């Protein structure tokens, strides 16, 4: 089932230039910018320029060029932030149970300190 994309979500508005961002990288298929509420010393969001709700939507509908472009941008952002060594974490929440807050696919790049366990047991 196709997911409904909200063209007025905050990331769509950033892509259209309606809301400013602290840009890190822009490519043909991706935009990366600093998170406004960082959870680590380095916390950068990487988003596709296309209208995709989440990773499920993106993996089903994106072109090969968009997929490669997004993931290459994630790597370029991590390297540019000096995070390739000693390491970094990437995370993308998909859907309500994962607590996805913005209905536009976004990949978090966290770095700059030891990050600890991925999730808490519950």
UniProtKB/Swiss-Prot annotation:
GO molecular function: catalytic activity
Record SUPFAM superfamilies: HIT-like (SSF54197)
Pfam families the UniProt entry points to: HIT
Residues spanned by motif Histidine triad motif: 104-108
HIT domain sequence ranges: 10-120
Record InterPro entries: Histidine_triad_CS (IPR019808), Histidine_triad_HIT (IPR001310), HIT-like (IPR011146), HIT-like_sf (IPR036265)
Name of the protein in question: Uncharacterized 13.2 kDa HIT-like protein in hisE 3'region
Species whose genome carries this gene: Azospirillum brasilense
